């Protein structure tokens, strides 16, 4: 598991390495397990303004800012979506907003999760 002291790039490398070890069904099972392990989001936060629109599943991303660091709570009605969001939230949780803004799409692409997402996710 990652720690809050790790940088974004270190967390990306951790998750990318874990995901690359798995193929096919095993990768999906791993992502589903991340969904099960993710912190529960109270129903009071499952509001329209926290919902990601355009996603086939219902996905809520609840941001919190503490001491100039971002924390994300995520939930979904679909395990693959929730697991994927939980991995991304883990990468960015506890990071400074300036560090998050420096992340490129190439950095995130190293995770290899784009391939499993449909256009609706």
Predicted regions, residues:
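Short, hydrophobic/amphipathic alpha-helical patches that form generic packing surfaces
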Residues: 33, 86-90
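Structural motif
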Residues: 21-25, 75-80, 120
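Extended low-complexity intrinsically disordered regions
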Residues: 3-45
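A general alpha-helix detector
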Residues: 14-15, 84-87
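Amphipathic alpha-helical interface surfaces
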Residues: 27, 57, 80-85, 96, ...
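Structured beta-strand/loop patches that form or line metal/cofactor-binding pockets in enzymes
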Residues: 42-64
